[in-house]
């Protein structure tokens, strides 16, 4: 983690907007802590598990951005809007839960939160996949080159659909 921190700090120092980017990452870290805290306090088992799964995905995305600070600008909406909004929504869910409110409006709000958590997790995963697309394309290009070299040397190498050779 020390090398990641040094790399990120150096990257920020070299950019005119580095201070803003650093502040954005610090805010994202606070938002993730708020989401994690709220998720830990949710008593409904399924909602708790879904909120924790969302937190884990958010953490992976955040860690990826720390390791690849050059991609932070590509994740602005995730960092600025989604993390903050999810933190506030889960915080309100916990507030209603802890207050023991059972009005139809509160139950409907909680139902909507339960319904949206898996969708948010999918969205976070898609964001991470998009950020990692260039690495995936590079690896696929490397595999094509390697396959071509193996074929020219007389080896038949082609991956099947299930990944076996």
Where are these regions (language model features)?
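Non-transmembrane accessory domains of multi-pass membrane transporters/channels
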Residues: 11-62
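Internal, Lys/Arg-enriched amphipathic helical interaction segments that engage polyanionic partners
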Residues: 7-9
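Short, small-residue-biased leader/transition segments that mark boundaries at the very start
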Residues: 1-5
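Soluble C-terminal extramembrane regulatory/interaction domains of multi-pass membrane proteins
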Residues: 49-63, 69-165
């Amino acid at each position: 983690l020390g090398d990641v921190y040094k790399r990120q700090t150096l990257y920020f120092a070299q950019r005119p907007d580095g201070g803003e980017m650093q502040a954005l990452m610090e805010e994202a870290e606070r938002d993730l802590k708020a989401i994690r805290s709220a998720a830990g306090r949710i008593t409904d088992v399924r909602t708790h598990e879904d909120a924790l799964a969302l937190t884990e995905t958010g953490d992976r995305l955040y860690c990826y951005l720390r390791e690849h600070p050059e991609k932070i600008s590509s994740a602005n909406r995730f960092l600025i809007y989604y993390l903050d909004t999810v933190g506030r929504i889960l915080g309100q869910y916990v507030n209603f839960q802890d207050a023991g409110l059972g009005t139809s409006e509160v139950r409907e709000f909680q139902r909507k939160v339960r319904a949206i958590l898996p969708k948010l997790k999918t969205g976070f995963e898609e964001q991470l996949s998009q950020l990692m697309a260039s690495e995936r394309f590079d690896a696929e290009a490397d595999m094509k080159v390697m396959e071509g070299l193996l074929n020219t040397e007389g080896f038949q190498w082609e991956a099947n659909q299930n990944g076996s050779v």
